[in-house]
């Protein structure tokens, strides 16, 4: 299954990684592709602090219930051996973030042609 993450909003990043975590928990491979603002969030390593703009009540509830942060979900995904995190080279260039690519922890960098080849025939696709 494949998740395409464009938005860097905390809730969407969390949802995308949760979908991937559910897939690997059932023994399925999962690939998450990062574009634009989602990619920027990963490059800035902003995966810990719940960030629900204008909704401190949700952030408080999120923490009090012990819900996993995106970082915790990412660690679970990596530990599964069934997960790949991919970054879009076009988005990387548009963000001017090429110097951050090597230390990003992103497994593979691809352009759209390669992304389309890798995901051809995948029926379970999620766009966030």
Model segments located where?
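A charged, amphipathic interaction segment
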Residues: 72-128
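N-terminal beta-loop-helix "entrance" segment that forms/cooperates
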Residues: 39-51
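Short beta-alpha junction loops
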Residues: 36-40, 92
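Short, hinge-like loop/turn segments at secondary-structure boundaries
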Residues: 48-52, 103-106
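Histidine-anchored nucleotide/phosphate-binding helix
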Residues: 14-26
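Short internal beta-strands
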Residues: 30-36, 86-88
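A glycine-rich helix N-cap at a beta->alpha junction
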Residues: 50-84
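Short, glycine-rich nucleotide/cofactor-binding loops
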Residues: 1-14, 30, 42, 62
């Amino acid at each position: 299954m494949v998740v395409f993450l464009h938005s860097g909003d905390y809730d969407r990043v969390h949802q995308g990684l949760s979908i991937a975590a559910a897939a690997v928990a059932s023994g399925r491979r999962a690939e998450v592709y990062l574009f634009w603002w989602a990619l920027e969030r990963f490059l800035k390593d902003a995966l810990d602090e719940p960030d629900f703009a204008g909704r401190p009540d949700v952030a408080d509830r999120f923490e009090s219930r012990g819900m996993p942060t995106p970082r915790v979900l990412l660690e679970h995904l990596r530990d599964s051996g069934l997960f790949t995190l991919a970054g879009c080279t076009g988005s990387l260039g548009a963000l001017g973030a090429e110097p951050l690519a090597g230390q990003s922890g992103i497994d593979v960098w691809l352009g759209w042609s390669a992304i389309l080849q890798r995901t051809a025939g995948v029926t379970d696709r999620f766009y966030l």
